[in-house]
Amino acid sequence: MFDQLEFYPAVNYEDNETQNDIKLPEVAKLENIETVHSISKERRDSLTEILNDSSSLPARPFSLPNPNNSTVEKQSLFPFEEKMNPIWIISRPTFSIEQDAEKKINELQTFTNIIDQILGQTNNIESTLLSMKEKFESSEKKLSEFSEMCENLSTDEMRFSEIADGIRKGLTIFAPLKELTRVFRHPPPDFAGKVSFKEHITQLNTCIMFLEENLDFQESPHYLGQYKKLLSQAMDIFKPYFIRIIKQTTDQVLKDSKKMDVHKQLHSSLFYARFSAVGHNLCPTITELCKLCSKESLDAFLPAFYDVYFQCRTRLLKPVLDYHLKSFFMEKSISSYIQKSLALLQLTFFDENKLFREILIMDDFRFMHYWNNLCQSFFENSRSLILHEKNLTELCEVCSYIQSFQNAILEGEREDVDKKVVEFLNPLVLELQERLLFVVQTAIETDIQRYSPTEEDLNPIADDKSLLFDLEKLRLNNDEEKLDPDVPQKLAMAQGWYPVVQKSLIILSKIYRLVNSQVFDEIALELVHSCIRSLVDAYRYFSRNNDKQLARLFLIKNFLVLKDQLNSFDIHYACIEAGVDLRKVWDSVREWRSNLRGVLQLVYETFPKFITNAVDTRQELNQQLRVAVNGYIETAVIHYTECLSIGNLESITEFQNRIQKFPELRQQISLYLSETWIIELFLQAIREEVVSKFQNFYESIVANEDITGSDHNKSGTTSLKHLNEYVEDIYSVMS
């Protein structure tokens, strides 16, 4: 009989349990150690009870497990059943189960002991960690206290460092007073020209700035007053040095200029190179001196510098400029003089402005005053030429050139030049405009208001190939375009315009945009009004000695030309005429003379009234043109229809003979009017009026009951045709 134990493979339970149990301490956490211990104890008690109960059970015969039983497969009680033949399996005795149970109990006991050891070690570790945590928190608290202490120490260190720096800076502010006082009270020779002088000035400014910002110091007011006194002494030391250097430089330049031709002096760097080098040394010192000076100190300090500098520069430049300006003046041409003089003065101004900024602090008012004194001869020569100039074209050219010169400076890109520099030419522009207006007024009185018409003016010879004078085509609205002043007059003469109209438009074209817009409007209104009155006078003159129709065509033509050309100008035609109304005064005087009771009324009404009337020159021009056109049309219609007498059929023949000469009327109109659409308007108006007159005549003939068509046919007179036939004949002849 085989031993039953030999059929069980040796299984190392300790190894399996050890392998399964080693991981328990890793899984269990410190906070759940007591729970794990209680659970293991309960399991151990339950296993003991199960073993005790199994020993009392009756022994069962051994049976081979069913291989298909799922429970056996799950429990894996016989892992070797697949390899062994079932016939070799013999039923196991009951005592082997007890041995296995005891063995299991021993293993569980061993496991329990191991768990107890692990739990004990875990408790020790937990207590160790808790103590370490407390020590760490204590260390962290001490560390934060230490960090806060370090920060306080760092703050105190920075504060003490600032105090130390302030003390050190205060020592540098208060300590130099004695040394600076000694230097400025007893300065060495040429002290202002040395580098140390500028360094001392910089140190003074630093001390003054610090004390002004820290007036709460105990002795700040005292030291501040002492330093400002030293700054005033520094100014007194620098002033004679500046004057001496400027005068020495001026004398050297004058000495060198005598060796050079006067024509080349301004074109060389003689007047600017040495002064620029001097300014390179003087300007920084002047800037430091003026940095913290009060306004009162500057007003007492800088004017002496400006006066000396401008006197020396005037001494250098004025003789040379006067020489060149005099040579320009000898040409006796105002346009040439202005152009050459401004070109020279522009270059000189830019150089002087640049040099002044390099030496002194820029003062626009003082510099412009100096510049006006330097240009005094230019203004005197210009006034002389302007007062003697009578040519309107020359004056307009000069005025236009000066305005272009000013605009070029205002629109220039030079930032170092003040745009107000153009103001020094404003007095010259005003004088030019005043002279321009005087010449224009003289031209209006002489050439327009006093013009006497001649027979040649009624029938001028016009060039058919000439173009219509159009101010817009001549680009008068473009400032950059310069026109030939003779072009408008030549074109006007080629078109056969009345000389008064020619001169009026030429004057307007010359002064357009050269004077104030309000002044131009006044001149334009006066010109238009004078031109209209002159044309009406010329019409009356031509009507006395010539055909009135030709005189009307002359008037219409020039009115149309004047109206068309005025559209090229921006003119406000409406103006206000002011006057005094004395009518009630004279009425009261007459009533007072006739009735003594009118004395009281005279007292109330002897004050004249100030009245204003609005005058529209364009409306006046349109009204005169309308009168002339209507007069011409009415006269032409009367010429064709005056032969029609009521009740006389023979007058129709005379009427037909007259309208046969209608092409002569077209030719007459074409002599004065060149535009086809205007001619057709005239002819259409005349044609319609003639037809209307003839219709009225025809209706009067038909309404006359004494006249019949049969009676006239019997008497051999002309028979009366239908009205439409007559109208068609009139249109066919007058078309």
Curated annotation (Swiss-Prot):
Function: Acts as a component of the peripheral membrane COG complex that is involved in intra-Golgi protein trafficking. COG is located at the cis- Golgi, and regulates tethering of retrograde intra-Golgi vesicles and possibly a number of other membrane trafficking events.
InterPro entries in the cross-refs: COG3_C (IPR048685), COG3_N (IPR048320), COG_su3 (IPR007265)
GO cellular component, one term: Golgi membrane
Organism per entry: Schizosaccharomyces pombe (strain 972 / ATCC 24843) (Fission yeast)
Keyword Translocase listed: no
Taxonomic classification: Eukaryota, Fungi, Dikarya, Ascomycota, Taphrinomycotina
Family: Belongs to the COG3 family.
Protein name: Conserved oligomeric Golgi complex subunit 3
Gene name of this polypeptide: cog3
Pfam family, one: COG3_C
Biological processes annotated in GO: Golgi organization; intra-Golgi vesicle-mediated transport; intracellular protein transport
S-S bonds: none
Assembly notes: Component of the conserved oligomeric Golgi (COG or Sec34/Sec35) complex which consists of eight different proteins cog1-cog8.
